[in-house]
Amino acid sequence: NITDATNSNEAYRIEIDENGVRLTGASENAVLYGLRTIQNLMVSNNGLVYGTIVDYPRMAERRLHVDCARKYISKDWFIRQIREMSYMKINTLQMHFSENLGFRIECETDPSIVSDQYLTKEEVREIIKEANKYGIKVIPSLDSPGHVDQILKAHPEYGQISNTGEHYKSGLDITNPEAVEYIRSLYLEYMELFLSLIHISEP
């Protein structure tokens, strides 16, 4: 145990003395965060001073939410951002890729809903691979049953129905079994791609 103050698997201890630097971490991620702290100390202090540091997060999850639905964001941008996240010890990236104004990841279930600019599945796999290198979890965010204008452009028949029998353009009709099965098929496709949690509501 790094410290009795926490059971966090991101806790680490740094001991600096005349014999050098000793870093002990509760996990691989903890060791990485310890190295980041050493890097920061060397830059800010122009070297290291003797002493002991015991560090651990107050919040187990530190998430960056990126809206890549309303505006296309490239794979290269995500790769750079993941490296920056590591320096800031942010351990979760939420990719909000579907919205009223866009659907930005390749969709094999229904290509008609995808925006003109989008990330391919191979690009997403590269993003996830890079995130894994830095101990960062990637969570997809697929808006539903609201904020689905982009989907309903292709499938207006799945929209909510008003008292006058007209379809709304912004909300999925969850009383329609076909609409429910359709959105479920999208969930399954992206759960298979990301192999992680999936966020299925408005942010």
Language-model region placement:
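Contiguous, structured surface segment used for ligand recognition
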Residues: N1-M59
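Aromatic- and acidic-residue-enriched carbohydrate-binding clefts of CAZyme catalytic domains
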Residues: S98-Y134, H147-E181
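Residue-level detector of conserved catalytic or cofactor/ligand-binding positions
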Residues: L195-P203
